[in-house]
Regions:
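C-terminal ends and interior cores of transmembrane alpha-helices
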Residues: 82-100, 293-305
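A late C-terminal transmembrane helix in Major Facilitator Superfamily
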Residues: 334-368
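Helix-loop-helix hairpin linking two adjacent transmembrane segments in secondary transporters
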Residues: 139-195
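Helix-to-loop junctions at the C-terminal end of transmembrane segments
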Residues: 60-73, 270-283
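Extracytoplasmic gate region of multi-pass secondary transporters
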Residues: 27-28, 218-268
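Cytoplasmic helix-loop-helix junction between adjacent transmembrane helices
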Residues: 109-146
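C-terminal transmembrane helical hairpin of 12-TM major facilitator-type secondary transporters
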Residues: 282-329
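Symmetry-related core transmembrane helices of the 12-TM Major Facilitator Superfamily/SLC fold
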Residues: 173-191, 371-390
Length: 404
């Protein structure tokens, strides 16, 4: 790696550090209560704002990648940073708006935040892989680490940024403003600091997703892998956005925000341990083992109802649910479906975004215990899909080798 790109790499990673706050802040019980009080809605209704992030990502997925290839990583990252600033500052303004359209403003801003996520993904994942070209796996793992570190620190940062409005409502606007302004600063830095000039010509000639779908034959196994992108995302997103509400209402825990730290610790440790385990255990085994662990954990948490179990559950779901399972699923797709790996991987990510929107929208209309049951059902479906793929694994490997 050229040392002149070290500051650039740090700037790119810091985008995901703040993203770690932005993508999980609406799942914090204290944030939900503050926003709900300001907007005159139920706390669980705030989950629909989180769902809008998934909708925005879903909207941007078809064109964010091609635009990144055409305009370059710098412009794609700048669009992502600017859009994220709109989302975060928009949340602060929406809080101030109260019942005068605050909820609607936040929903629109969250869609913009989801679009930002897509542009950050297409710009930064490629850019850091081009900077740390000798170890692209380590480069992308760094993104997950920066997200997890931010999420681990979030409960403590919330306590430091709390304020009280004239109306007597608890406000976390300072945090929204700080993160939004930080994204504006990062946008400027991204435009100033050097980035490697990757050859985009070949990428520009790649077949688009729509054209690829027209003549791609999908086997039942490839459909199962796409659906796993939906189920595994649902497992950790429902936990991330709704588990603290379950802890407050069903366990009686007054302030469960520390669960976020345990969740993030599980994710961080999983990134390292899973990377080591995949050297000895086939990747495909994890798309069964990890959902089984999540399923058992969710059942125990639902039936046990204790603070200790909530903390243990947060750590385990962070490990087995959010610690790279989606990335493992895409890796398995690349190996098992060599001729359509780009198409299948894209559809796995679309399924993931679709889950963010549909499942969280549904959760916003439920009670926390009902959300936990829905998560159990969704995870159980993921277990069945993982079992099917593992049973068919040997046959699929033979087919993949024949295609090569």
């Amino acid at each position: 790696m050229n040392k002149k790109y070290l500051p650039s790499a740090l700037i790119l990673y810091l985008n995901y550090f703040i993203h770690g706050v932005g993508c999980s802040i609406l799942g914090q019980a204290v944030i939900k209560e503050a926003l709900a009080a300001s907007w005159g809605v139920e706390a669980m209704a705030i989950t629909a704002i989180s769902a809008a992030l998934g909708l925005g990502r879903l909207i941007a997925l078809p064109f964010a990648g091609p635009l990144s290839d055409k305009l370059g990583r710098r412009i794609s990252t700048a669009i992502g940073s600017g859009s994220y600033a709109i989302y975060l500052i928009g949340l602060a303004l929406a809080f101030n708006a109260g019942t005068n359209g605050g909820y609607q403003i936040a929903y629109v801003c969250a869609i913009v935040g989801g679009i930002a996520n897509s542009f950050l993904d297409t710009g930064i994942y490629q850019a850091v892989s081009e900077i740390i070209y000798k170890a692209p796996g380590v480069a992308t793992m760094g993104i997950k680490f920066f997200i997890a570190i931010a999420q681990m620190m979030l409960p403590f940062v919330l306590g430091a940024t709390v304020a009280t409005t004239v109306a007597g409502l608890t406000s976390y606007n300072m945090l929204f403003y700080i993160c939004g302004i930080a994204y504006i600063v990062l946008l400027v830095l991204v435009m100033i600091f050097p980035l490697p000039d990757a050859d985009q010509k070949a990428a520009g000639k790649k077949e688009g997703l729509i054209d690829s779908l027209k003549h791609t034959h999908f086997s039942i196994e490839s459909v199962a892998m796409i659906l796993i992108g939906f189920t595994c995302t649902g497992t950790f997103q429902l936990w991330l956005n709704c588990a603290q509400n379950f802890a407050k209402e069903n366990v009686g825990w007054a302030n469960p925000s520390i669960m976020q730290t345990y969740y993030s610790a599980g994710t961080m440790i999983a990134l390292v341990v899973t990377a080591l385990l995949t050297r000895k255990i086939k990747d495909v085994r994890f798309i069964l083992i990890y959902p089984v662990i999540c399923l058992v954990t969710l059942i125990v948490v639902l039936t046990g109802k204790s603070e200790a179990l909530m903390l243990a559950g947060a750590f385990i779901i962070g490990w087995a649910g959010a610690g790279g399972l989606l990335q493992i699923a895409t890796s398995v797709c690349n190996m098992l479906f060599p001729k359509i790996k780009g198409t299948v991987t894209a559809l796995v990510m679309i399924a993931s975004s679709l889950c963010n929107y549909t499942i969280l929208t549904a959760a916003s209309k439920m009670q926390p215990a009902q959300v936990m049951v829905m998560n159990i059902v969704l995870t159980a479906i993921g277990v069945l899909l993982g079992l099917f793929v593992n049973i068919r694994y040997a046959k699929m490997v033979e087919q993949a080798e024949a295609e090569n």
